[in-house]
Amino acid sequence: MERRQSICPQGRLPFYSAVVRSTSDIQASVRFASRHNLRLVIKNTGHDSAGRSSAPHSFQIHTSLLQNISLHKNFIARGSTTGRGPAVTLGAGVMQWQAYVHGAKNGYTILGGECPTVGAIGGFLQGGGVSSIHSFTRGLAVDQVLEYQVVSAKGDLITANEDNNQDLFWALKGGGGGTFGVVTEATVRVFSDDPVTVTSTKIEAAAANVLFWKEGVHELLRLLQRFNNLHVAGQLVISAPTKDSLQAGLELHFANLTDETQAIQLLRSEARALETHGISASTSVRVQRKASSELRMKPDLYPPHYGILEASVLISAATFHANDGPALIASKLSGLTLKPNDILFTSNLGGRVSENTAIEIALHPAWREAAQLVTLVRVVEPSIEGKLSALNDLTARDVPILYSIDPAAKISYRNLGDPQEKEFQARYWGADNYARLAATKAAWDPSHLFMTSLGVGSEVWDAEGICRKRRGFRAKASSLIGM
């Protein structure tokens, strides 16, 4: 019988997938993977452009059917006798839109993102969690976590909160998903689903018009800076409708305001005219009686035909709020060439994100000093060559431009980071936090059953997590982060 010759029989798709329906299913799957020394990956919705929820020759645990939602009037964590206030427990498979709909029916909302099909407690939450509307006034998603239920590498069900397994609880608040165990459910704070009035200022110009960036984007960033100082959050989105045009839109979120006239008057009192620069501008306003409606009706970020690549950078409050901050940022961003369907957007940090210093999280300490997160989304051509070219361009050309905005820091967001980031330990967590995460990883998963690309401990494995490198994990990690 002739032997088949196949170099890559199934690409990065797992050979097998356990579509779990219960915690006991997850425990059995983890023990099976450990017993047979399988390359294990965890997947819910798969919203990860770096491929962390898939791997070649792997065994996948698919959590999308864990759909439980339980609302608590006054949640008491296990091991505690003190109530922590209103909260909701979400199963691993619950998506953002499902949490928003359940909340809207029951008079609450959670701190979630604007992409409705992202999982609420998977990589989004465990990686940090940013909300374009709520982070400025409430903080990060990980600031809201009260408790995790986790299946460990041994297959045990573990409770992680402020009273139990505190090291694991801390690591899961920004250390990344699929790295320390399988989170089966998480309990997070909820808050009232208050109204919000959203103003939208849109500009458009020819791609060749350099004043689009120098005057138009500069002005929108100046407005964002000004309204942040007035305690109003916002988001700037820049795109290319065609290869010959550019557009940008600034949405400002006036929390607990339902007066359209007042919102427009506030905006117009601060805005400067742009039409004289060959830039068309328009303004609109809408009132949402529930803020969750603004989030759950957002379109999905992913194009229907193929995939995307992402890169991101934090902008410090010192840079953003400097007198020349908006002009500097606009000038740097103008170096990015946007193609149709590419997106460049900001996410408002600062505010409560900076104030929540009493809450320990595993993210880089610079998050507490940042004003904005800037993310670039590149649409990938539907071919292997197209993806490789786009990936190399992202790393070699786009990321250096993003990092040049705040060159002394160069901090990125793992959930939206360059898939080829070489200094991920320093970019995502910093030396001290990475050392602590490495110790937690060694304690809870010494055999590295759980491993993700650019995750804690991944530096001792090859790119696909199949072959271990010779040097020990702690020694390798220490050398990389300069400990």
From Swiss-Prot:
The EC number(s) attached to this protein equal 1.-.-.-
Superkingdom, natural source? Eukaryota
The cofactor(s) it depends on are:
FAD
A single GO BP term for this record reads: indole alkaloid biosynthetic process
InterPro entries (UniProt xref): BBE, FAD-bd_PCMH, FAD-bd_PCMH-like_sf, FAD-bd_PCMH_sub2, FAD-linked_Oxidoreductase, Oxid_FAD_bind_N
Q: What class of enzyme is it?
A: oxidoreductase
Q: What outcome is recorded for mutants in which this gene has been deleted?
A: Abolishes the production of clavine alkaloids but also of more complex alkaloids such as ergopeptines. Accumulates N-methyl-dimethylallyltryptophan (Me-DMAT) and traces of dimethylallyltryptophan (DMAT).
Q: Does the keyword Oxidoreductase apply?
A: yes
Enumerate the UniProt keywords alphabetically.
Alkaloid metabolism, FAD, Flavoprotein, Oxidoreductase
Per UniProt, residues of the FAD-binding PCMH-type domain are 10-193
Keyword Flavoprotein annotated: yes
Q: In which pathway does it act?
A: Alkaloid biosynthesis; ergot alkaloid biosynthesis
Q: Name one GO molecular function term.
A: oxidoreductase activity
Gene3D superfamilies in the cross-refs = 3.30.465.10
Q: What functional role does this protein have?
A: FAD-linked oxidoreductase; part of the gene cluster that mediates the biosynthesis of fungal ergot alkaloid. DmaW catalyzes the first step of ergot alkaloid biosynthesis by condensing dimethylallyl diphosphate (DMAP) and tryptophan to form 4-dimethylallyl-L-tryptophan. The second step is catalyzed by the methyltransferase easF that methylates 4-dimethylallyl-L-tryptophan in the presence of S-adenosyl-L-methionine, resulting in the formation of 4-dimethylallyl-L-abrine.
Spell out the family assignment given in the record's similarity comment: Belongs to the oxygen-dependent FAD-linked oxidoreductase family.
The protein's name in its UniProt record: FAD-linked oxidoreductase easE
List the taxonomic lineage. Eukaryota, Fungi, Dikarya, Ascomycota, Pezizomycotina
